[in-house]
UniProtKB/Swiss-Prot annotation:
The keyword Phosphoprotein does not apply. Residues 24-43 bind DNA. GO terms for molecular function: DNA-binding transcription factor activity; transcription cis-regulatory region binding. It comes from Cereibacter sphaeroides. Transcriptional activator for the cbb operon for RuBisCO and other Calvin cycle genes. It holds the Pfam family LysR_substrate. The gene is cbbR. The lineage of its organism: Bacteria, Pseudomonadati, Pseudomonadota, Alphaproteobacteria, Rhodobacterales. This is HTH-type transcriptional regulator CbbR.
Length: 310
């Protein structure tokens, strides 16, 4: 029975060296060993396989591989190739040229995330980008549990503690269908605005938090009619259908505004200008691949954001 756990790389290389030079002396010279040392390596290898691997005919005195030896030599060559490839991959990972990076993006960012990932794949072709999308609360939880390496979001959280860098503008406003009574007004009266029905994401959404603060400040705590919906897409289609108004990231409705399906209302204090941030937890250093991706995202200067030049 072959004892695989007794086989070493040194033994395999000794076999390759002796078979290649046809002598113990030649093989020892190749490896910088003494002939007795290389003979010991081959003997141990033959004992591990349980069969002779080299044959030395008396008439020539040169070592030649047996059929079993040929099989082991071919395996040894494949092992060297695999180790060489592995060495390249390890170096690539350690230098940030390869690896996997999990990028978290808040739900609002799903409208530009594919473009960002495409740009990163061109800049870092050997780094695999895994995208993880969720609302603000989910993303903060992912950061705390180290489920993501980097995250693109609005206002950075207080906990967990993160390092952040601003990526680009993130405007918010109120949108309505083009035939809405408040559409086209130079300035929407506050009482008229607060009397409307608003469509909004559920609690935990960063946009919902910003909307609540804006309406509370505008109405001094006045209760506003609110209908919760599960996604920005549902909200957009509902506004287009005339079910109400919506306070949204203008990046979410860029196409609808461009094609006239929605209009932006001239409400007091709007648009609210926020920023997109790239964040990562400070309690765990970024791996080389994540550092590379971080640098590439910053270098893009928001070129992937809606409305940015193609």
């Amino acid at each position: 029975m072959v004892r695989l756990d007794a086989i070493t790389l040194k033994q395999l290389r000794a076999l390759v060296a002796v078979a290649g030079s046809a002598s113990l002396t030649g093989g020892a010279t190749r490896l910088g060993l003494t002939p007795p040392a290389i003979h010991s390596q081959i003997r141990n290898l033959e004992e591990a396989f349980g069969v002779p691997l080299l044959h030395r005919p008396p008439e020539t005195g040169s070592f030649t591989p047996t059929l079993a030896g040929i099989a082991v030599l071919e395996a040894a060559q494949r092992i060297e190739v695999i180790l060489s490839q592995c060495s390249y991959q390890v170096m690539a990972v350690s230098e940030g040229r390869a690896g996997q990076v999990t990028l978290g993006v808040v739900s609002t960012g799903r409208y530009f995330a594919p473009r960002l990932v495409k740009m990163l794949s061109l800049a870092c072709p050997e780094i695999r980008i895994a995208l993880r999308v969720g609302n603000r609360e989910q993303l903060i939880d992912d950061l705390a549990r180290h489920m993501v390496d980097l995250a693109v979001m609005g206002r950075p959280p207080r906990q967990p503690e993160v390092a952040s860098v601003a990526l680009g503008p993130h405007p918010h406003g109120i949108v309505a269908p083009p035939d809405h009574p408040l559409a086209g007004l130079a300035e929407v009266p506050v009482p008229d605005l607060l009397s409307q029905t608003f469509l909004a994401r559920a609690e935990g959404s960063g946009t919902r938090v910003l909307m609540s603060r804006y309406l509370d400040r505008l109405g001094e705590g006045q209760v506003v009619d609110l209908i919760e919906m599960d996604s920005n897409e549902t909200i957009k289609q509902s506004v287009i259908a005339g079910l109400g108004l919506a306070f949204l990231s203008l990046h979410v409705v860029m196409d609808e505004l461009r094609f006239g399906q929605l209009v932006q209302l001239a409400a007091p204090g709007l648009p609210i200008e926020r920023h997109w941030f790239l964040v990562h937890p400070v309690d765990r250093p970024l791996n080389p691949a994540a550092l590379r991706v971080q640098g590439e995202i910053v270098k893009l200067k928001g070129a992937y954001l809606p409305g940015a030049p193609a």
